[in-house]
Design a protein with these regions (language model features):
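Conserved alpha/beta enzyme-core scaffold
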Residues: 6-455
């Protein structure tokens, strides 16, 4: 970022500027350390999810050791920062990733706030952090493009920018793409709302591509059979959704649309294969719609100033009523386990958090609003625990399990042994259909359990 449009404030005087004093003019350009010094020992800080993390700023905050009670609201931190291991720093996370799981394992105070992605915005508004910090790209007009993440924080960033009692800090990263907003919406933070700018140079996080197994490929092949040539797609994270996209990219025909909370490398592959036209969508036609993106550096480069992909707030992208208006909509997500009632566990193991609900339930619910649409929940039939094969399809969920998606939203479950279409089926019928796609080792006992299932 050039300093010609920023007011440079030295560390000797910036502490004495009132919050909001610089509003309406160019934002102050500070060093990361000076920006970090603007937070009080007891304070509240809000962060954007994942690719919106301001890495340089978080590293600068990590260098401070005078915290008394710093409360942080965020989700899916992409990196390990010493800040979060400080005993006086308390992190309220709406979604767990590898960093949150690691922090929990080393005794850091990281607490889950159970909420779907759409609920993050009201949760953050209630939290009302005094300081909001975000990583952005600088656009051609000198304003701040939220790049790979709009999500649930955009409105809170603007509120912080308009409030003279609050502080809005933007970290500019030259490696981030400038992305396009969905028509009728904005994903740009005006420069006059920003209090402080710092310069970052962190390489953009690339999501490692999971290696697909033969089981994953079989599941993906079965799932692809449910997808209409003019389908609008949503895919979650993981090897199986990526494999589904690859199957679609390689098979004959296909004029697909994209309406997906997360834009992934798999969806980019579909674009690259010429299989995405967005011409058959009944809402937001002509563009792929998303609210955040994680993938490869090549995907990010492709997204730069590319109008083929449009970003919008999560309350638009994840609205089930809007999702359901797409013709032949197919939602493809994973799960950890499912019981014979069709209850889905997708974000925890025995009550221990490993990820979050995200938009899982929104897209499952949206897909059920039209008989031409379908939600596919894909998972391997078994998992090995300490060398012992266990079924992921169980008669009942273990004590302490947390249901991510209730049975009344469940449509189709796919394993390597087939697909169980539960739509319109009775409790007993659903149970037997699920038993039939379990591993053969467990089918008899599951069918027996299905006979005795309460209904």
């Amino acid at each position: 970022m050039s300093t010609e449009n920023a007011v440079v404030i030295s560390s000797s005087c910036h502490r004495y500027l009132k919050v909001g004093q610089n509003r309406g003019v160019s934002p102050r350009l500070l060093s990361p350390a000076d920006a970090a010094a603007l937070l009080r020992p007891t304070d509240t800080l809000g962060l954007g999810l994942g690719p919106a993390n301001p890495h340089t700023f978080l590293n600068a905050l990590s260098a401070r050791d005078d915290w008394e009670n710093l409360q942080i609201g965020g989700a899916l931190v992409l990196g390990l920062f010493g800040l979060f291991t400080n005993p006086h720093v308390h992190y309220r996370a709406g979604f767990f990733g590898p960093a949150e799981r690691y922090l929990r394992s080393v005794g850091a105070d990281v607490q889950l706030v159970p909420a779907g992605f759409r609920q993050f915005e009201p949760v953050l508004r209630q939290f009302a952090p005094r300081v909001m910090a975000v990583q952005c790209a600088r656009d051609a007009d000198g304003n701040f493009n939220t790049s790979l993440h709009v999500g649930a924080t955009f409105e809170e960033l603007l509120r912080a920018g308009r409030d003279p009692e609050r502080l809005l800090i933007v970290e500019v990263n030259p490696h981030l793409p400038v992305t396009t907003a969905l028509e009728g919406y904005t994903t740009t933070i005006p420069a006059e709302l920003v209090d402080v700018v710092i310069e970052g140079d962190q390489p953009v996080f690339e999501l490692p591509e999971e290696t697909a197994t033969e089981v994953d490929e079989t599941i993906a092949d079965i799932a692809a059979g449910f997808i209409h040539p003019h389908a609008t797609l949503q895919t979650g994270i993981g090897a199986i959704p990526t494999m589904v996209a690859r199957h679609l990219a390689q098979r004959e025909g296909g004029e697909y649309g994209i309406h997906s909370e997360m834009f992934t490398t798999g969806l980019w592959m579909l674009h690259q294969a010429g299989k995405v036209t967005n011409s058959h969508k009944s809402i937001f036609p002509g563009v792929s719609v998303t609210t955040f993106a994680l993938g490869s550096s090549a995907m990010y480069e492709w997204m730069n100033n590319n109008p083929a992909v449009a970003f919008a707030p999560v309350d638009i992208v994840n609205d089930p009523t809007l999702i359901g208006r797409n013709r032949h909509f197919v939602s493809i997500n994973g799960a950890i386990s499912v019981d014979l009632y069709g209850q889905i566990v997708a974000d925890s193991v025995a009550g221990r958090q490993i990820s979050g609900v995200g938009g899982h339930e929104d897209f499952v619910a949206g897909a059920e609003l039209d008989t031409q649409n379908v939600s596919l929940i894909c998972l391997p039939a078994t998992i090995e625990v300490n060398g012992v094969r266990q079924s992921r399809i169980t008669a009942q969920l273990p004590l302490g399990s947390i249901v991510s998606t209730p049975r009344h939203h469940t449509a189709v479950i796919v394993t390597e042994f087939g697909a169980a279409d539960l739509r319109g089926r009775t409790v007993s019928e659903r149970a037997h259909l699920l038993a039939e796609i379990a591993h053969p080792q467990f089918r008899d006992e599951l069918h027996l359990a299905a006979e005795n299932l309460a209904h």
